[in-house]
Amino acid sequence: MRNIIYKAEDVVDSLSTLRKEGVKKGAWTGFDSLFDKYSVKKGSTTYIYAGAHQGKSQFGFELMMNLSEYSGWKWAVYTPETGSPTEVFAELLWVYLRKPFLINDHLTATDEETEKAISFINDHFYIIDSGLQDLSVEGFYTAVDQIEAENFITIDGCMIDPF
């Protein structure tokens, strides 16, 4: 069992290092105006809180995409309110393309851009979808372990929206 209780003497060497070197910033979020105040470190937790329909999910998608593009992060995503896995991937494609994924009468991604985007999304995002069944936090992280084992990768970040 791993240790979850510490005394200062248990971490005196790392305290000394921290004292000398200071706190290191995490990965760049892709937002210049945000980076002065916020960065993301692997293993840390971020909670995005606001009222209904304020863009929390979209902001989370933007953060995930930027961390994938600029730092190579791989993600496990559970976001049942966004829709089916197809609909979640479509949202991620829209974020990656920075223009509409769906074909419409206005500006839209080309087939070539879409193929490149699908390849990128496929390499960096794994959607966990329990259908109409409940999914516990433990069940989510069991699925993350399964993703890592079956794909021989490490998931760098998880998005659970909402839980």
Tell where the protein language model's regions lie, with residue ranges:
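The Walker A/P-loop phosphate-binding site
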Residues: 2-99
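Cytosolic-facing regulatory segments adjacent to core modules
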Residues: 32-36, 70-154
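Short glycine-centered, acidic/aromatic-flanked micro-motifs in structured strand/loop junctions
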Residues: 50, 129, 162
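Helical hairpin unit composed of two closely spaced alpha helices linked by a short loop
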Residues: 156-163
